[in-house]
């Protein structure tokens, strides 16, 4: 296994690090909030008295978006995030590293079996707050979520943008950010992905979002795009 020759902060993305390896390869990483613990079998690196977790571009759509040049990484230390579709917590664990011990990630997942796996991650990472719930019904968990700085959404639903906007109306601060992974094939298998992206983006615009960037996630995820937007509360 190739050895580390340097780890340095990413020049563009807050809370993200570049790992340079002996074989010339370069990896993305986050500083491990819980040293010694892995979440999904990722490689751990030690450098300068700190531990870093490799951020797998093929396992995390946010990592893929960063690798493909997303305009900005808006998540900051201490932020509160609403995560819709947290699954087993791969991406959420890296966001957990970035927001740190003073941040909070309200993590909504619909599938009980998947949530059971996520709870094991949240037991170790105290800034993750598991919520077994349906992202289509934000009213049902409104008593569990505070106003948040940002929403991260990765939900396989036909009306992804509308669901996110409904949640934003409840929980997202004015000028709060959205990172939405659009899964074209989850919305309509009969239409071209570009048509789906355009439709979902138009929905976001109609609901008060200003689109800052849209990045396609190939080769890491086929027929996916990451939308980065800001919300203007009415």
UniProtKB/Swiss-Prot annotation:
Listed EC numbers: 2.1.1.-
InterPro entries: Fibrillarin, Fibrillarin_CS, SAM-dependent_MTases_sf
GO biological process: box C/D sno(s)RNA 3'-end processing; tRNA processing
Gene3D superfamilies: Phosphorylase Kinase, domain 1, Vaccinia Virus protein VP39
Transmembrane segments: none
One Pfam family this sequence matches: Fibrillarin
Top EC class, one word: transferase
GO terms for MF: histone H2AQ104 methyltransferase activity; RNA binding; rRNA methyltransferase activity
Residues that hold S-adenosyl-L-methionine according to the record: 90-91, 109-110, 134-135, 154-157
SMART domains assigned: Fibrillarin
Keywords assigned by UniProt, alphabetized: Methyltransferase, RNA-binding, rRNA processing, Transferase, tRNA processing
Subunit and partners: Interacts with nop5. Component of box C/D small ribonucleoprotein (sRNP) particles that contain rpl7ae, FlpA and nop5, plus a guide RNA.
Annotated family: Belongs to the methyltransferase superfamily. Fibrillarin family.
HAMAP family: RNA_methyltransf_FlpA
Protein's UniProt name: Fibrillarin-like rRNA/tRNA 2'-O-methyltransferase
Source organism (scientific name): Staphylothermus marinus (strain ATCC 43588 / DSM 3639 / JCM 9404 / F1)
